Structures are given as structure tokens and as C-alpha cells.
Design a protein with these regions (language model features):
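Internal gly/pro-rich beta-alpha loop/helix module
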Residues: 1-68
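Structural motif
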Residues: 12, 79-83, 248
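A short acidic, often aromatic-flanked loop/helix-cap motif at beta-alpha or helix-coil junctions
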Residues: 13-19, 110-113, 187-188, 216
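Short acidic, glycine/serine/threonine-rich loops at helix termini
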Residues: 18-26, 89-91, 131, 165-166, ...
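C-terminal and late-domain segments of enzyme folds
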Residues: 47-48, 70-72, 84-94, 98-102, ...
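Phosphate-binding active sites in nucleotide-utilizing proteins
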Residues: 74-148
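Hydrophobic, well-ordered secondary-structure elements that form the walls
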Residues: 119, 156, 178, 211, ...
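Cysteine-nucleophile active-site neighborhood
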Residues: 126-198
Length: 264
């Protein structure tokens, strides 16, 4: 490190460490005593003296790029609960800047599909909620009808898994899911993919990342494959009518215009 630059790369081991599972830390809403744990960890950090911050720096206000309201008048239904919670705040900000009306629903709670022009099924942990999700047949029936009449659907990672006929969880238990795409997703004991992805879709180039412990088994031929920054083949991207599904978590600000075309 350059002279004068400190390093702080770890916290001391503590019984107050944050709990984790196969895709990393548990989500904040799942940890009842989160604030208390963070306070204790902050106290431990302060004791070391290694976390002293440098003097504050003032930055000029950044001018956000102008985004045309290409989704004005469109109503976008977004799954959001413990099974579908991997949502970048910047993605929601981009959708609002595009003019979309956002309506959230909870597949775990038994919600059916709200009236909408397009649907986004983000990533998460559907494999941990197989029983509740497999019982919500009203939702899957509505999604099938949504896709069949040519309305847009974007499914990412856990969203992709949910579109298959089955998800096989880590215990080997099979759960019936959407049946919108043929095949199944099977949980593995080890990480199956991790890293940045670039998707050159017909709507435009989009950037994102992949991080999952499942494998898909499907007879579908991908529309195309994403690529890694160094040019290697990445995740398969499937297209059925206006539905687009893959393991890639897309960062919407990377190309708002392409997102608007995907969802309109």
C-alpha cells in the first residue's frame, strides 16, 4: 500500500456476526436483531482504531443522465418478498425515471398477478419457499396467460427457476412451479456460476452479474448467451414470445432504453 494509506479488511470474529446462507448474507428483513448486531460490530471496530476515516472530501454534484419516459403509462408488476428480494434500488429508480407505475406483489403470501402491462420476477430464494410457491397456482396460471397473449415478462435467476416446471431443492424435494418454460432447476452443493455478464440482446447491450447454486435442465435453445468481460461464454438467455429469462441479474442503469424496450 502507498505510504500513509491504512488497510482494514476484516472484523474480529464475534458471536454477533451476521448469519449467512448459500448466496451470502441473509437479507436484512430476515434478521430480527440486525440493528443490535451492527451496533456491537461497530463498537468492536472502534476498539481497534483501524477504522478511523480520513478527512471528509467534498464532491461536485453529479448530473444524472436524462432518461426519456419510454414506459410512461405502463404498469409494471414486481414480485417482492423473501423469495424474490434481489432488487437493486437503482433498478427501481430507473424504472420510475422511465415513467413506469410500479406495483409490488408477494407470491409467498398467495398474491395473484396484479393487473399490469409487464412483469418482473427478480432473483431470490424460491427454492427455500417451494411449498408456499407451489401452492400459489392462481399466480402461475395468470403468468401463463400473461405470456401467452404476448405481454412482456423479465425473469432473473430465481425468477428463471420459477418459470420451469419444477425446482429440486437441496434436500432433493421436488416442487411444482410455473410450467411456463419446459424443464427444471436443480440445486447443487457447490457454487455453479459467479461473475460479471454482458448481454447483447436485440433490444441493446445490458450489463449484470450471475451468482447461483442451481443448474437448469431444459430442452430450450437459448436466444443467445451472455458473455464475460474477457469474452468467454456466459449464461444462456431464453426468449419465449415477449418473455426473457436467464440467470443474469441485470443492472438496469446500464441501458435504460434497452430495459424500456424489453418491458414495453
Amino acid at each position: 500500500l502507498p505510504a500513509g494509506m491504512g488497510w482494514y479488511g476484516a472484523l474480529p470474529r464475534s458471536e454477533d456476526s451476521l448469519p449467512e446462507r448459500h448466496l451470502g448474507l441473509m437479507q436484512a428483513a430476515e434478521i430480527d436483531d440486525l440493528e443490535s448486531r451492527l451496533d456491537k460490530l461497530a463498537d468492536e471496530l472502534a476498539k481497534t482504531g483501524a477504522g478511523q476515516l480520513p478527512p471528509a472530501v467534498e464532491f461536485a454534484d453529479a448530473t444524472p443522465p436524462l432518461i426519456a419516459p419510454l414506459l410512461a403509462g405502463k404498469r409494471l408488476a414486481i414480485a417482492r418478498d423473501a423469495a424474490y428480494g434481489f432488487i437493486y434500488p437503482a433498478n427501481l429508480e430507473t424504472l420510475r425515471a422511465l415513467g413506469a407505475e410500479l406495483v409490488f406483489f408477494s407470491p409467498i403470501a398467495g398474491d395473484s398477478l396484479p393487473a399490469c402491462d409487464a412483469v418482473w420476477l427478480p432473483g431470490g430464494y424460491p427454492e427455500l419457499h417451494g411449498k408456499a410457491l407451489s401452492q400459489n397456482q392462481a399466480l402461475w396460471t395468470a403468468l401463463k396467460a400473461h405470456v401467452a397473449i404476448g405481454k412482456p415478462l423479465l425473469a432473473e435467476c430465481g425468477g428463471l427457476m420459477s418459470l420451469f416446471e419444477q425446482i429440486i431443492d437441496k434436500a432433493g424435494v421436488s416442487h411444482n412451479f410455473g410450467g411456463i418454460l419446459p424443464g427444471r432447476a436443480v440445486m447443487q452443493k457447490r457454487l455453479t456460476a459467479l461473475g460479471m455478464q454482458i448481454a447483447d440482446l436485440p433490444e441493446g447491450q445490458l450489463s449484470g452479474h450471475t451468482f447461483h447454486y442451481s443448474k437448469s435442465e431444459t430442452p430450450l435453445t437459448p436466444l443467445l448467451r451472455a458473455r464475460t468481460p474477457d469474452g468467454r461464454d456466459g449464461e444462456a438467455i431464453y426468449r419465449m414470445l415477449r418473455s426473457t429469462a436467464s440467470y443474469v441479474h441485470i443492472y438496469f442503469p446500464s441501458n435504460p432504453t434497452a430495459i424500456a424496450h424489453l418491458l414495453s
